[in-house]
Design a protein with these regions (language model features):
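Flexible glycine/acidic-rich beta-alpha junction loops that bind and position SAM and/or redox cofactors
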Residues: 45-51, 67-130, 137
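Radical SAM/AdoMet-radical enzyme domain recognition
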Residues: 1-90
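Radical SAM enzyme core and accessory elements
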Residues: 113-179
Length: 179
């Protein structure tokens, strides 16, 4: 069972508006109780999510602890799988895609790269996957025009929804102007 999210917890409501985190987790737990079921939380990799992917992994690992499912489950064919997984999913990329990682200013990228180190050991266990994301943050050029387009889109969305980017993601404050 794949559950498509953008963030772990109530932050998810910002991009997946409106969503109720309690309902998402409640439904995930129901599916986890079904036999031969594997739960995967999947997200896109975009300008807002890339700095928070460790929180998703950490949340999934918390469910593994809660369900004591670190060792995996052996199915009827003898294959071992873990009940709870996460996947970084698709990379937002391409001409005109406002939420591509290239729209992230360099100072925010530094903040996000530092976050990857804050989570420590469990990131080292999956080093290759995390290194790809880290390298992407570090090496992709900043696209200032795309950044401006993204911020304009965010501001219009916030005005329409009655939300505010910087209430959830304060690192964007220097770049955010309320309409």
């Amino acid at each position: 069972m794949t559950i498509s999210i953008e963030f772990w917890g109530n932050k998810n409501n910002y991009l997946r508006f409106p969503s109720k985190w309690e309902v998402i987790i409640k439904n995930a737990r129901k599916f986890a109780d079904c036999p031969r079921t594997r739960i995967v939380f999947a997200t896109t990799v975009n300008a807002l999510t890339i700095g928070y992917l460790p929180e998703i992994a950490y949340g999934v690992y918390g469910l593994r602890d809660e369900y004591d499912s670190w060792s995996g489950i052996i199915n009827e064919n003898g294959f071992t799988y873990n009940l709870w997984h996460w996947a970084s999913g698709s990379l937002v990329w391409g001409d005109g895609n406002q939420y591509a990682v290239t729209a992230i200013p360099l100072d925010i990228r530094e903040t996000y790269m530092y976050k990857y180190f804050e989570y420590g050991d469990f990131l080292r266990e999956e080093y290759v996957e995390w290194q790809k994301l880290y390298d992407y943050l570090e090496n992709m050029p900043f696209d200032e025009e795309l950044h401006k387009e993204m911020m304009k889109d965010i501001q219009v969305r916030d005005k329409h929804r009655g939300t505010c980017l910087t209430d959830i993601f304060p690192e964007w404050e220097p770049y955010y102007e309320k309409l």
